């Protein structure tokens, strides 16, 4: 008998993957966690029925969350990742030698635990000496921080359950306070096909707080619609005005210095969402 997993991305549309076996399933304090081995995409982390990451395509999301802001900032030393318990963004952050400390604040410790066990190629960097892992509420951590970070990355689930507070104007204002005077922040902001209103709302809220606010995209096969957006807010440095000499060689599979600028070239229907 064949076993298949289906994520209903809307009431009328979804994606399906053939499952070889279930590695772990658990109702944590915060969400339903499933780790499965798929035929096509390797091991897959699923939270509340939504695909969070897979071994095959994870690099796209993690590279684009990390490298766009880190190459935009001239000297990122202290970095905060809110969410991201799978460790993929942290792995990419550590590719930048200027980073002296990377802090991860993940609300669900079980995500960290089982990512280390079943997604070692993604989560392996969490044990690096430059990394501090905190199991706790990222919203509260931001509220308690001031003038501390060069770059803040919000690697959250969609705005449901424990992540709902991470999509509020108050949270973005807190991020601005937690950043240094030339700090940069980035957040994943879902897809333009199924959640256009979210993109419009987040962009508007961020733009009212950060003088430089831009939207960029990446193609991620297992995420709803495949076209994903990210909103970047910066106090001083424009991601479209990065000097050539700032780019240094790092090992990537998706991000390149050419793609850095190209990612900000939006399809018209996406650009219309933020006018």
UniProtKB/Swiss-Prot annotation:
GO biological-process terms attached to the record: spermidine biosynthetic process
Active-site residues (renumbered): 155
GO molecular function terms listed in the Swiss-Prot or TrEMBL record: spermidine synthase activity
Top-level taxon of origin: Bacteria
InterPro entries noted in UniProt: PABS, PABS_CS, SAM-dependent_MTases_sf, Spermi_synthase, Spermidine_synt_N, Spermidine_synt_N_sf
EC numbers for this chain: 2.5.1.16
Binding positions (spermidine): 62, 86, 155-158
Pathways per UniProt: Amine and polyamine biosynthesis; spermidine biosynthesis; spermidine from putrescine: step 1/1
Reactions catalysed, as given in the entry: S-adenosyl 3-(methylsulfanyl)propylamine + putrescine = S-methyl-5'-thioadenosine + spermidine + H(+)
Subcellular location(s) of the protein: Cytoplasm
Subunit description: Homodimer or homotetramer.
Protein name: Polyamine aminopropyltransferase 1
Species this protein is from: Bacillus anthracis
């Amino acid at each position: 008998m064949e076993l298949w997993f289906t994520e209903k991305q809307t009431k009328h549309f979804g994606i399906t993957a053939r499952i070889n076996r279930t590695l772990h399933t658990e109702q944590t304090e915060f969400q339903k966690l499933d780790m499965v081995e798929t035929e096509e995409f390797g091991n897959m982390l699923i939270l509340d029925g939504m695909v969070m990451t897979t071994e095959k395509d994870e690099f796209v999301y993690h590279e684009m969350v990390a490298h766009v802001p880190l190459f935009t900032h001239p000297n990122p030393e202290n970095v905060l990742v809110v969410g991201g318990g799978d460790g993929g963004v942290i792995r990419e952050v550590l590719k930048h030698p200027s980073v002296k400390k990377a802090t991860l604040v993940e609300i669900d410790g079980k995500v960290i635990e089982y990512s280390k066990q079943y997604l070692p190629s993604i989560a392996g960097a969490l044990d690096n000496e430059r990394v501090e892992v905190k199991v706790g509420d990222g919203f509260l951590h931001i509220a308690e921080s001031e003038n501390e970070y060069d770059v803040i990355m919000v690697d959250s689930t969609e705005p449901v359950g424990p992540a709902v507070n991470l999509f509020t104007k108050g949270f973005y204002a807190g991020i601005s306070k937690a950043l240094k005077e030339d700090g940069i922040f980035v957040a994943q902001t879902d897809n333009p096909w199924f959640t256009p209103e979210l993109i419009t709302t987040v962009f508007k809220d961020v733009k009212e707080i950060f003088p430089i606010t831009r939207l960029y995209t990446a193609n991620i096969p297992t995420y709803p619609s495949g076209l994903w957006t990210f909103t970047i807010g910066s106090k001083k440095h424009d991601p479209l005005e990065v000097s050539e000499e700032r780019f240094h060689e790092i090992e990537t599979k998706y991000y390149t210095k050419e793609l850095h600028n190209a990612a900000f070239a939006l399809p018209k229907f996406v650009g219309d969402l933020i006018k």
